[in-house]
């Protein structure tokens, strides 16, 4: 399983999300870290090099190395790319 790391701003982004949705996001991250499965898409343009995990109405923007996942943003889909 890959380690999951968070940028300093991410915990505060997760705290403002409804508890049920936040738990779903964390479960989806753990599932991806363990199995590599999930609704993931490689991004381009301004976000080139990042991946997006889709969890309901939320988007998790992260990058991945051989041993870790670093989460950069967790936002509602309408705000994720602004």
Where are these regions (language model features)?
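Residues forming the ATP-binding cleft of Hanks-type serine/threonine protein kinase domains
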Residues: 75
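NAD-dependent ADP-ribosyltransferases
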Residues: 60
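Basic, Lys/Arg-enriched alpha-helical interface segments
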Residues: 1-54, 65-72, 80-82
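Glycine-rich phosphate-binding loop
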Residues: 57
